[in-house]
Amino acid sequence: MSDTTILQNSTHVIKPKKSVALSGVPAGNTALCTVGKSGNDLHYRGYDILDLAEHCEFEEVAHLLIHGKLPTRDELAAYKTKLKALRGLPANVRTVLEALPAASHPMDVMRTGVSALGCTLPEKEGHTVSGARDIADKLLASLSSILLYW
């Protein structure tokens, strides 16, 4: 495709418009990721996502995002064991999933499953950072179970 396009049945020439509205403007500060520091790149906690995608397992990247660092071999094994133990779904969540139409979109199923999980296992008021990480681990472990059960 060229930089200019002629509309069918028209003499008008249009040019693609580059979106520059927020180009170079920080949208927020986070320790989790940086976007576009050196072009069209994305880094998670300082690691280039292309390197992570090529060299890491899913659980390693999840550990990096949730717990702040890449795990050692022993930490990774323990983390996988923890996630496996958290995969179970409460009966109330299974009942909600059973009521969903078979033609539902998987994203809608996950959203509904997470909502049911939140109602069944509500967060405590004023939980700690460690408690927030436990919640994230439970959600991470539950998403595949939600889809597979449905």
Predicted regions and their residues:
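Hydrophobic alpha-helical bundle cores within soluble ligand-binding/oligomerization subdomains
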Residues: 2-150
